[in-house]
């Protein structure tokens, strides 16, 4: 009898468990129908969605990166393997994008020191965006060994003239001519002008956050050394050269490891421009308000360097508002600009007249 009792009880317990399991399953199904899923399942589903989206994003990035890499590779391949190019023009256009290490012409065979270093005749230039005319008939002649200064009111076109000579892409020459060492300057690229010996120290030096100063300077110097048939400098050789040069401008060696002009003070930026001038040794230096924004010590240091660097083998075009720098450099000629034209040229005595009576005496309103 006892065995039969436990058998009946076991069957009864199993029946209850099965009914409970059925009820639980039924409740879960009802929740699923009406959108009431368990939090655990929701979290699991959300996690799966995030993982899926992350994978899709990574796949997209992979294809985009490889697309860019393939494009660069194909361009290089096309330029080196001529089977993809149908004409000589196509081959030349592709090769122009590669670094050109060949020598270029930096002066006319007929040019000598008795011929003007820079000769500008009736120069007109406009802004590329907007088409506003800034330069309206500039005439300027500079010989080797001379120092010229451009002065004038704000907005008269001084900085624009400096940038047009250097080949700034924001401006376009519409009329007139510029010759440098006998070459037609308007036909030359910015890099070509630099190799010819033209150097521009910006009023507001550009920041290059991703380029270290030593890499920038060494690359620029090696371009000039190649042009002069001199061996390129390795990083270690360049560092040795810079030990003395960087001291001249009052900067520490750690300065070379910093990005170009990024996070620099105003004085450091200007001294960095002067450092470039010392390294590249250009024959024509354009200083666009290099003296502005400098404290007393930085101004004295900068002006002393410019004065020592100036010699019979180079020329200067100095854009400034201040008499103090001109007192030290003693330019041969002073030019006054107004509304895109040079309206007056004279010797250093013009500086004293400007200092006493301003520009109104030279301007016909």
UniProtKB/Swiss-Prot annotation:
Disruption outcome: Repeated attempts to isolate gene deletion mutant failed, suggesting an essential role of the gene during asexual blood stage growth.
Metabolic or biological pathway: Cofactor biosynthesis; iron-sulfur cluster biosynthesis
UniProt-recorded Gene Ontology molecular function terms: 4 iron, 4 sulfur cluster binding; ATP binding; ATP hydrolysis activity; metal ion binding
Cellular compartments annotated: Plastid, Apicoplast
Positions contributing to ATP binding: 152-159
Residue ranges annotated for the ABC transporter domain, each copy included: 118-364
Enzyme class label: hydrolase
Catalysed conversion reaction: ATP + H2O = ADP + phosphate + H(+)
A Gene Ontology term for the protein's cellular component: apicoplast
Superkingdom of the organism of origin: Eukaryota
Function: Participates in the sulfur mobilization (SUF) pathway for iron-sulfur (Fe-S) cluster biogenesis. As part of a complex consisting of SufB-SufC(2)-SufD, involved in assembly of [4Fe-4S] clusters. Exhibits ATPase activity.
Assembly and oligomerization: Component of a complex composed of SufB, SufC and SufD in a stoichiometric ratio of 1:2:1. Interacts with SufB. Interacts with SufD; the interaction enhances the ATPase activity of SufC.
Family note: Belongs to the ABC transporter superfamily. Ycf16 family.
Listed name of the protein: Iron-sulfur cluster assembly protein SufC
Biological source species: Plasmodium berghei (strain Anka)
Lineage: Eukaryota, Sar, Alveolata, Apicomplexa, Aconoidasida
């Amino acid at each position: 009898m006892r065995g039969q009792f436990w058998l009946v009880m076991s069957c009864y317990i199993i029946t209850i468990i099965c009914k409970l399991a059925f009820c639980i399953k039924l409740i879960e199904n009802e929740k699923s129908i009406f959108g009431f899923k368990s939090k655990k399942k929701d979290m699991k589903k959300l996690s799966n969605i995030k993982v899926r989206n992350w994978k899709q994003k990574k796949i997209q990035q992979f294809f985009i990166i490889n697309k860019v890499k393939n494009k660069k590779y194909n361009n290089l391949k096309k330029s080196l393997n001529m089977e993809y190019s149908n004409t000589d023009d196509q081959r030349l256009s592709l090769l122009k994008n590669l670094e050109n290490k060949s020598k270029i012409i930096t002066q006319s065979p007929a040019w000598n020191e008795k011929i003007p270093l820079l000769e500008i005749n009736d120069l007109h230039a406009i802004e590329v965006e907007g088409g506003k005319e800034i330069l309206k008939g500039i005439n300027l002649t500079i010989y080797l060994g001379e120092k010229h200064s451009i002065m004038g009111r704000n907005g008269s076109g001084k900085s624009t003239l400096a940038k047009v000579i250097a080949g700034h892409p924001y401006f376009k020459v519409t009329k007139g001519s510029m010759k440098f060492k006998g070459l037609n300057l308007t036909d030359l690229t910015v890099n070509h002008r630099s190799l010819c010996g033209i150097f521009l120290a910006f009023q507001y030096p550009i920041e290059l956050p991703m380029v270290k100063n030593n890499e920038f300077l060494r690359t620029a110097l090696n371009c000039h050394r190649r042009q002069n048939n001199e061996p390129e400098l390795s990083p270690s050789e360049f560092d040795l050269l810079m030990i003395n040069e960087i001291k001249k401008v009052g900067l520490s060696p750690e300065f070379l490891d910093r990005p170009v002009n990024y996070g620099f003070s105003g004085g450091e930026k200007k001294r960095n421009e002067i450092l470039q001038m010392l390294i590249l040794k250009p024959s024509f230096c354009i200083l666009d308000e290099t003296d502005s924004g400098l404290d007393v010590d930085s101004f004295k240091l900068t002006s002393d360097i410019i004065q020592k660097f100036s010699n019979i083998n180079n020329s200067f075009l100095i854009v400034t508002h201040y008499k103090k720098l001109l007192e030290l450099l003693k330019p041969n000629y002073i030019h006054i600009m107004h509304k895109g034209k040079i309206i007056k040229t004279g010797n250093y005595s013009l500086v004293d007249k400007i200092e006493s009576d301003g520009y109104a005496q030279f301007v016909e309103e």
